[in-house]
């Protein structure tokens, strides 16, 4: 990467995820160029998405359905919703310091005034109802064995536990 002053840097974050193939790999540029010639916004799923969905299902025998999202925020929002619908439970557990998007349910973080072994949550901005961090999210301490105790304690109300194994963008 090169900034406006001509300084060069190594992108050790891979663009926080989406650049796992590097910055501007020729094969990706060519694929984008080829697709643009066919169109770039269709509004409804097309043959390419159906083909990719089948490839993903074949690669993972337990996968029954595939849903494509246009952002990580949208993906986690639907994952939270699906987990709540499937389990009938309401609470989602997140690890302190992780980033899972900009929707109401992901805009929570540990309250720094709370006990690290059992962090309480607060929102990261205006407009998120108080009920979200207080009743719908469980903040877990990252790299702390007390997280397991909290998961066991709240297991009857947990719809899911979201794990970001390598924290990178928060």
Where are these regions (language model features)?
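Active-site pre-Tyr helix/loop in NAD(P)-dependent dehydrogenases
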Residues: 15, 98, 166
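Active-site flanking residues adjacent to catalytic metal/cofactor-binding acidic residues
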Residues: 10, 95, 163
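Glycine-rich loop-to-alpha-helix module at the N-terminal edge of alpha/beta enzyme cores
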Residues: 8-89
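Alpha-helical structural elements of signaling/regulatory helical domains
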Residues: 41, 153-157, 167
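Short, acidic, Ser/Thr-enriched surface-loop or helix-capping motifs
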Residues: 3-4
């Amino acid at each position: 990467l090169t900034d406006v002053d001509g300084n060069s840097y190594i992108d050790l974050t891979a663009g926080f995820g989406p650049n796992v193939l590097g910055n501007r790999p020729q094969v990706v540029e060519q694929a984008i160029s080829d697709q643009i010639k066919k169109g770039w916004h269709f509004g409804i799923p097309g043959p390419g998405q159906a083909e990719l969905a089948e490839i993903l299902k074949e690669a993972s025998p337990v996968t029954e359905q595939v849903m494509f999202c246009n952002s990580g925020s949208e993906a986690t929002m639907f994952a939270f919703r699906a987990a709540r619908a499937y389990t009938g439970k309401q609470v989602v557990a997140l690890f302190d310091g992780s980033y899972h998007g900009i929707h109401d349910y992901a805009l929570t973080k540990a309250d720094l005034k709370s006990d690290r072994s059992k962090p309480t949550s607060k929102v990261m901005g205006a407009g998120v109802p108080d009920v979200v961090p207080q009743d719908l999210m469980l903040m877990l301490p990252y790299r702390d064995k007390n997280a397991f105790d909290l998961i066991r304690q709240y297991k009857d109300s947990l719809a899911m536990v979201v794990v970001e194994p390598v924290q990178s963008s928060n």
